[in-house]
Amino acid sequence: MKVTFEELKGAFYRVLRSRNIAEDTADACAEMFARTTESGVYSHGVNRFPRFIQQLDNGDIIPDAKPQRVTSLGAIEQWDAQRAIGNLTAKKMMDRAIELASDHGIGLVALRNANHWMRGGSYGWQAAEKGYIGICWTNSIAVMPPWGAKECRIGTNPLIVAIPSTPITMVDMSMSMFSYGMLEVNRLAGRELPVDGGFDDNGQLTKEPGVIEKNHRILPMGYWKGSGLSIVLDMIATLLSNGSSVAEVTQENSDEYGVSQIFIAIEVDKLIDGATRDAKLQRIMDFITTAERADDNVAIRLPGHEFTKLLDDSRCNGITIDDSVWAKIQAL
């Protein structure tokens, strides 16, 4: 089915207000969920909303909590999220990293006691739109086996890197081949994964998203490399925020909350003039996209460049929502 942006935001707002969320908070949160969905990221927009409400109802998310600054060391700050709403808090933290970068050239905010930030790419994009390089990542509950194991002991720990090119170039990736949200998107669409995404119950690689969702044997990106990167990202976020590690979140909390996150902004224009920056970025992009194609029917893509097209399509033709997901939201 198709809905307009206003219909989608209104549905989110209604549910949030029914939970006695303050009007301005409900409006801002609904806006972020709707913008994420409008950009084509269903997995962390509309599809994730019922799960968000479940955590809100369970008390994992404290909607009226206010993040508090704990430590300030010039370009580096440490904050406690107080388990406030994840996407609103993350937006505020990247804004703060940008403010620090405007003063120091680079700004880093380490956040503890946070909730799921939904679409991590929103915060990298937020920085890049203002001309900054944006880098951020989060840890999570243990939902992925480390390389060589059957049991989940590491997080998917998504990493975002956004560059202020024209258009914005951005990598937004979990440390697994596919996020659990993308497994759901493919399962709901009745599709196999395009490449192996995990192991089946017999230990064989599989492209079946439903199987991986059930047994949680999701495949690390790049096999042992993604496993290793997940581990060190967790360590850095834990140490800089003085927050909870994947192990602590998993063993001490009843669900995925109280996670640790990092937000970095770099004001590149302090290091290079605008004309030179643009020329260098364009040369990089042209060098890549003019390579001989392996398949004439498949374009060479740069990461993040598809989002402008997806956004335009949603605004022209409406936002596609899975019927079963829409029914869940209407029932909340």
Swiss-Prot record:
Domain of life, per the record? Bacteria
Fetch the Gene3D superfamilies from UniProt.
1.10.1530.10, Hypothetical oxidoreductase yiak, domain 2, Hypothetical oxidoreductase yiak, domain 3
Keywords on this record? Cytoplasm, NAD, Oxidoreductase
> Which InterPro entries did the record assign?
Diketo_gul_Rdtase (IPR023689), Mal/L-sulf/L-lact_DH-like_ah (IPR043144), Mal/L-sulf/L-lact_DH-like_NADP (IPR043143), Mal/L-sulfo/L-lacto_DH-like_sf (IPR036111), Malate/L-lactate_DH-like (IPR003767)
Among its keywords, does the record have Nucleus? no
Reaction(s) catalyzed by this protein?
Answer: 3-dehydro-L-gulonate + NAD(+) = 2,3-dioxo-L-gulonate + NADH + H(+); 3-dehydro-L-gulonate + NADP(+) = 2,3-dioxo-L-gulonate + NADPH + H(+)
Q: Name one GO cellular component term.
A: cytoplasm
Instruction: Give the SUPFAM superfamilies listed for this entry.
Output: L-sulfolactate dehydrogenase-like
EC number of this enzyme: 1.1.1.130
Q: What's a Gene Ontology MF term here?
A: NAD+ binding
The protein's location, in the record's own words, is:
Cytoplasm
Catalytic center at which residues? 44
Q: Where does NAD(+) bind?
A: 168-174, 224-225, 304-306
Its biological purpose is as follows: Catalyzes the reduction of 2,3-diketo-L-gulonate in the presence of NADH, to form 3-keto-L-gulonate.
HAMAP family attached to this UniProt entry: Diketo_gul_reduc
Self-association and partners: Homodimer.
To which protein family does this belong? Belongs to the LDH2/MDH2 oxidoreductase family. DlgD subfamily.
Protein name as catalogued: 2,3-diketo-L-gulonate reductase
Q: What is the lineage of its organism?
A: Bacteria, Pseudomonadati, Pseudomonadota, Gammaproteobacteria, Enterobacterales
